[in-house]
UniProtKB/Swiss-Prot annotation:
This is Myotubularin. Changing residue 406 to P: In CNMX; severe. It comes from Homo sapiens (Human). Residues 1-13 have a biased composition (Polar residues). The modification Phosphothreonine is found at residue 495. InterPro entries: GRAM (IPR004182), Myotubularin (IPR030564), Myotubularin-like_Pase_dom (IPR010569), PH-like_dom_sf (IPR011993), Prot-tyrosine_phosphatase-like (IPR029021), Tyr_Pase_AS (IPR016130), Tyr_Pase_cat (IPR003595), Tyr_Pase_dom (IPR000387). It catalyses: a 1,2-diacyl-sn-glycero-3-phospho-(1D-myo-inositol-3-phosphate) + H2O = a 1,2-diacyl-sn-glycero-3-phospho-(1D-myo-inositol) + phosphate; a 1,2-diacyl-sn-glycero-3-phospho-(1D-myo-inositol-3,5-bisphosphate) + H2O = a 1,2-diacyl-sn-glycero-3-phospho-(1D-myo-inositol-5-phosphate) + phosphate; 1,2-dioctanoyl-sn-glycero-3-phospho-(1-D-myo-inositol-3-phosphate) + H2O = 1,2-dioctanoyl-sn-glycero-3-phospho-(1D-myo-inositol) + phosphate; 1,2-dioctanoyl-sn-glycero-3-phospho-(1D-myo-inositol-3,5-bisphosphate) + H2O = 1,2-dioctanoyl-sn-glycero-3-phospho-(1D-myo-inositol-5-phosphate) + phosphate. PROSITE patterns: PPASE_MYOTUBULARIN (PS51339), TYR_PHOSPHATASE_1 (PS00383), TYR_PHOSPHATASE_2 (PS50056). Changing residue 179 to S: In CNMX; mild.
Length: 603
């Protein structure tokens, strides 16, 4: 990542303002409340604009552009509007109107965002105000095209916890009871030579040598060999992930790959067959043969059962989300809402992903069969299926820390292409690699949390802040496509982790109804009747759609929890004071208060 200082546009910097205060989230604010700033964030320019609000019409305001955000504050006395948009959220910037435009507010900029909203600003035609704002926004929203660093490498925030220590692969596998006499940890990929998109540490069958792994890698797309993701604590069945076999049109076979899958199958003595879930529709899997890919045939893999899960590819998901945006922003058409939502097929895709994950979880838990999961390259649909199945099977992943580990492990370390799918700092908004695969996963988690309201330690805000910073480029957590790229860029040394922000203020993200249950398997109902559009995420920018507020019972429960904590604190203070009095030598007959025993509480 090239590093460069801020450019000539620094002339409007607010650095000379001497009086600042720091809010609880670490954001510096000057006393005039002009614009919030993070440590390392600098103001580039500010301009007077007309914000074309799709809900309330034109609003006169001042827009501030920093190296991290676009911040608009209304200048009108009857409007308190504020827009706070991280530049990483911006997907496209276009000029609207030309030199001959005569319509009111017809000359300015159109900004398309990745988080389901668009922005439109009208500017004066004289003084090159549009050109200046366009160039500055383009430069800092798409820094990779201008040899500038992503803001995460400039962010100087400090937190009292280090989110980079959340996930340690050795500790996580040890929690699962690994290694054991069937599975071993290998460092064959420590320099990312076996597979450059896999993590350095892998768990593989004990009976498979490193040379076996190298031979298997030649027959799997991108060298992404079958490796263990999760082992059942009781029946010892496993979830294994990989990419498609390189069968091709001629139906090539690889004895090493076939033997390797047999070794995986033999780690489980309860069932005679290994279950393979191919996430793709069968027609797509067949079509992949033309490009050298394919699937495990019955002829070659006698001891395996293959099932196709009919989950569509990244291009279908991208178009589906575009249709969702069309119906939720800026206006929601009530009269045709249900038919419009159905036409997007978004919930249908959510249903298919959840259904596939349920099959994986059920086969492992109830069917007592080990499972191998793959799609084409094993970093999109595969990650969705393994992580959701693990969330259903393992209650640890339903805690805040456990979910962070799940994301770090199954998505980040195993090479989901965040940079390509999100387009961090990249101006090529038409890139065919863009796709909302991780958003879809988080949506599935939200659907599960609605069906099991006491099963998850985290609340909806936890999921939303993860999605917001998926785009923001404020943290290093989701940057780059794989672990090897993050190592080269020293991401853990040079950037801050999103988990640092979350774990320094966990109470904000806790579900008050959470009940910790060990070994409870969740089987959500993946029917269209039980799935719903996540209004608080997809339609949150529309002020006419009332946000779903916590119900009175939840609010009262949270108040009681706060009251309990306050009473416990007071009680501890009284006990400390009483202990101090009892330890002092009495100078007079004991008073009733000195004789008071420690009070026990049922809280």
């Amino acid at each position: 990542m090239a590093s460069a200082s801020t450019s000539k546009y620094n002339s409007h910097s607010l650095e000379n303002e001497s009086i600042k205060r720091t809010s609880r989230d670490g954001v510096n604010r000057d006393l005039t409340e002009a614009v919030p700033r993070l440590p390392g964030e600098t103001l580039i320019t500010d301009k007077e604009v007309i914000y074309i609000c799709p809900f309330n019409g034109p609003i006169k305001g001042r827009v501030y552009i920093t190296n991290y955000r676009l911040y608009l504050r209304s200048l009108e006395t009857d409007s308190s509007l504020i827009l706070d948009v991280p530049l990483g959220v911006i997907s496209r910037i276009e000029k609207m109107g030309g030199a001959t435009s005569r319509g009111e507010n017809s000359y300015g900029l159109d900004i398309t965002c990745k988080d389901m909203r668009n922005l439109r600003f009208a500017l004066k035609q004289e003084g090159h105000s549009r050109r200046d704002m366009f160039e500055i926004l383009t430069r800092y929203a798409f820094p990779l095209a201008h040899s500038l660093p992503l803001f995460a490498f400039l962010n100087e925030e400090k937190f009292n916890v280090d989110g980079w220590t959340v996930y340690n692969p050795v500790e996580e596998y040890r929690r699962q009871g690994l290694p054991n006499h069937h599975w071993r940890i290998t460092f064959i990929n420590k320099c990312y030579e076996l597979c450059d998109t896999y993590p350095a540490l892998l768990v593989v069958p004990y009976r498979a040598s490193d040379d076996d792994l190298r031979r298997v890698a030649t027959f799997r797309s991108r060298n992404r060999i079958p490796v263990l993701s999760w082992i059942h604590p009781e029946n010892k069945t496993v979830i294994v992930r990989c990419s498609q076999p390189l069968v091709g049109m001629s139906g090539k076979r690889n004895k090493d790959d076939e033997k390797y899958l047999d070794v995986i199958r033999e780690t489980n003595k309860q069932i005679s067959k290994l279950t393979i879930y191919d996430a793709r529709p069968s027609v797509n899997a067949v079509a992949n043969k033309a490009t050298g890919g394919g699937y495990e045939s019955d002829d070659a893999y006698h001891n395996a059962e293959l099932f196709f899960l009919d989950i569509h590819n990244i291009h279908v998901m991208r178009e589906s989300l575009k249709k969702v945006k069309d119906i939720v922003y800026p206006n929601v058409e009530e009269s045709h809402w249900l038919s419009s939502l159905e036409s997007t097929h978004w919930l249908e895709h959510i249903k298919l992903v959840l259904t596939g994950a349920i099959q994986v979880a059920d086969k492992v838990s109830s069917g007592k069969s080990s499972v191998l999961v793959h799609c084409s390259d094993g970093w999109d649909r595969t990650a969705q299926l393994t992580s959701l199945a693990m969330l259903m099977l393992d209650s640890f992943y339903r805690s805040i820390e456990g979910f962070e580990i799940l994301v770090q492990k199954e998505w980040i370390s195993f090479g989901h292409k965040f940079a390509s799918r999100i387009g961090h700092g990249d101006k090529n908004h038409t890139d065919a690699d863009r796709s909302p695969i991780f958003l879809q996963f988080i949506d599935c988690v939200w659907q599960m949390s609605k069906q099991f309201p006491t099963a998850f330690e985290f609340n909806e805000q936890f999921l939303i802040i993860i999605l917001d910073h998926l785009y923001s480029c404020r943290f290093g957590t989701f940057l780059f496509n794989c672990e090897s790229a993050r190592e080269r860029q020293k991401v853990t040394e040079r950037t801050v982790s999103l988990w640092s922000l979350i774990n320094s203020n966990k109470e904000k993200f806790k579900n008050p109804f959470y009940t910790k249950e060990i070994n409870r398997v969740l089987y959500p109902v993946a029917s269209m009747r039980h799935l719903e559009l996540w209004v608080n995420y997809y339609i949150r920018w529309n002020p006419r759609i009332k946000q779903q507020q916590p119900n009175p019972v939840e609010q009262r429960y949270m108040e009681l929890l706060a009251l309990r904590d306050e009473y416990i604190k007071r009680l501890e203070e009284l006990q400390l004071a009483n202990s101090a009095k009892l330890s002092d030598p009495p100078t007079s007959p004991s008073s009733p208060s000195q004789m008071m025993p420690h009070v026990q509480t049922h809280f």
